[in-house]
Amino acid sequence: MALLDFFLSRKKSTANIAKERLQIIVAERRRSDAEPHYLPQLRKDILEVICKYVQIDPEMVTVQLEQKDGDISILELNVTLPEAEESK
């Protein structure tokens, strides 16, 4: 039957193929552009709290928000702390 299905199946039109590809591109773009408006302020607030306790370069703090499967969000915070100064 598979051989019969192969010969009798209709091929997708180029318009349908283009539509599917465009939907994939739009979905990918929505995921990548989905950075919330509050993320820069959140980064600034976190940096201020860290600076209360440790002298740090602002470039050493990165905050990223990753969304998976539409309903799961992962907030990733990377802080490179300076090496501890030795007591003399």
From Swiss-Prot:
SUPFAM superfamilies associated with the record: Cell division protein MinE topological specificity domain
One Pfam match: MinE
Superkingdom of this protein's organism: Bacteria
The keyword Hydrolase belongs to this UniProt entry's keyword annotation: no
Biological processes, Gene Ontology terms: division septum site selection; regulation of division septum assembly
InterPro entries for the chain: MinE (IPR005527), MinE_sf (IPR036707)
Keyword terms: Cell cycle, Cell division
Gene Ontology CC: plasma membrane
Family as reported in the entry's similarity comment: Belongs to the MinE family.
Function: Prevents the cell division inhibition by proteins MinC and MinD at internal division sites while permitting inhibition at polar sites. This ensures cell division at the proper site by restricting the formation of a division septum at the midpoint of the long axis of the cell.
Name this polypeptide is given: Cell division topological specificity factor
Organism of provenance: Salmonella typhimurium (strain LT2 / SGSC1412 / ATCC 700720)
Gene name for this UniProt entry: minE
